[in-house]
């Protein structure tokens, strides 16, 4: 299902014109407003006026986890804090968390790409969406919440935990969409089995699962135990959160990237060479 026909079906030529404009704007803002970015670009001899085509993207330096941590917490913001309406952060399990600031417009963009993602995954206006992603500094809960509301669904903002209560709520509210990590979806299924709750007592049709790796075997197990179609979603807080790309319910053959907002590159990590589609190496994204 397509949410935003204008941009999701944009002809490639028009899409690339839009991408180049946004790339130029992004590089200019980063260079002139953020000293660490300017120093990083100066090191490789890149200035905003050097961006003439999308091919010039490969000349930009990488932004790494260490670079983000070195400028913790707000050193990479392009706007003053009085224009930043929200801050999210990673868990920081391997060091200082990586921090991302959102303007009001960023929040609107996030809602837009998440609405596209949920529609792509089979969520419809009027669905009852049981959102069991965590709310807080983690981006999952609020990102999914915004997208579902924009799509016109009814959101149950339950977050994680209290699994027995969650099962009761899904039964009583007639929830037909489950948003959660795949491991928590299995937790729900196992708790249902322990309680003697039949899958048929739920109205679940589709589950949108992400925020952690999961296998095809895990997908099959979730689908069997919860009686739904399990769909994969991808995102990361350093870019925007969930909503970067999404598996479609029709084909389930890879993930669709919303290319008017995110530009993927396939890069050999050893040589830095940009490779054609189909190569299995590292994926880099620009937002």
Positions of the model-derived regions?
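Nucleotide 5′-phosphate-binding alpha/beta core
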Residues: 1-89, 94-112, 116-120, 216
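Active-site glycine/GP-rich loop and adjacent strand/helix microenvironment
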Residues: 2-31, 35, 151-287
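Short glycine-enriched loops at secondary-structure junctions
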Residues: 84, 107, 134-136, 183-184
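Acidic/glycine-enriched edge-of-secondary-structure segments
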Residues: 95-109, 145-155, 175-179
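Short secondary-structure capping/junction motifs at helix and strand boundaries
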Residues: 97-101, 122-128, 156-158, 231
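Short, conserved acidic/polar surface loops in the N-terminal third of protein domains
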Residues: 99-103, 123, 140-143, 189
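Conserved ATP-dependent adenylate/AMP-binding module captured primarily in the ANL superfamily
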Residues: 111-128, 162-175
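Conserved AMP-binding loop of ANL adenylate-forming enzymes
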Residues: 119-155
